[in-house]
Amino acid sequence: MVCDTLVYHPSVTRFVKFLDGSAGREKVLRLLQYLARFLAVQNSSLLARQLQAQFTTVRKFLRFLKPLNHLQAAAKFYDNKLASDNVVRVCNVLKNIFFAAYLSLDQVNLLRILKVIPVTVLTGKKIPRWSNWCWLFGLLSGLAMDLRKIQTSHAQIAAFVKAKSQSQGDEHEDHKKVLGKAYQDRYTALRRLFWDAADSFIVLNNLGYLSSNEEYVALSGVVTSILGMQDMWKAT
């Protein structure tokens, strides 16, 4: 009876569904990768460092052909000529193109790790650096989009607050609902801004433009991994 209760519990069912797809597993492995990276520095653990490397490699397998998702998304955003905000549209196009390039170059890194291609200056140094640059440009496009959304939602809130104070009855309730949505949009944009900024902190350290403590870089990865898992959990 207890076993049945656990097996059929909604949370367990949701968790199984969360891990059923490669995207959910990749998010969990990303969290484990950065946790291992943090423990490797904190405890000078060789095992944690080895686990970090293994989690990183497995994630590369799970992201195989994922660039196609971003290319399709970029094409859809580009074709959406009726978008309400062209700044957001352009940022979405650029973000997905750069992420597609980043993930494509990362597949070369996987082939190098598997020793399918030889380790050369190109495959061992230049391509990993180009990959990080594409990741950074994708994040910068995301940051620009986040700031634009914050600006837009803030302007909407100011307008709705003014309209709400002058409305009555049913109209007042309608303005209240719209205002609530505007506040939610602003919160979502602020959350995404923090997320993209934390990931940018990681990649800037990867590129050598920052030389922060390894613990802080690892913790940034842990935080952004949790944010990604939260979004995926809500969508499950």
UniProtKB/Swiss-Prot annotation:
Pfam families reported for this sequence: PEX11 (PF05648)
GO BP annotations listed: medium-chain fatty acid transport; peroxisome fission; peroxisome organization; regulation of peroxisome size; signal transduction
Membrane among keywords: yes
Subcellular location: Peroxisome membrane
Topology in the lipid bilayer: Peripheral membrane protein
UniProt GO cellular component terms: endoplasmic reticulum; peroxisomal importomer complex; peroxisomal membrane; peroxisome
Keywords assigned: Membrane, Peroxisome, Peroxisome biogenesis
Principal location listed in the UniProt entry: membrane
Job description of the protein: Involved in peroxisomal proliferation. Promotes peroxisome division and biogenesis.
Family: Belongs to the peroxin-11 family.
UniProt-listed PANTHER family: PEROXIN 11, PEROXISOMAL BIOGENESIS FACTOR 11
Remaining remarks: Present with 1630 molecules/cell in log phase SD medium.
Subunit description: Homooligomer. Interacts with PEX34.
Name the record gives this protein: Peroxisomal membrane protein PMP27
Species whose genome carries this gene: Saccharomyces cerevisiae (strain ATCC 204508 / S288c) (Baker's yeast)
Primary gene name: PEX11
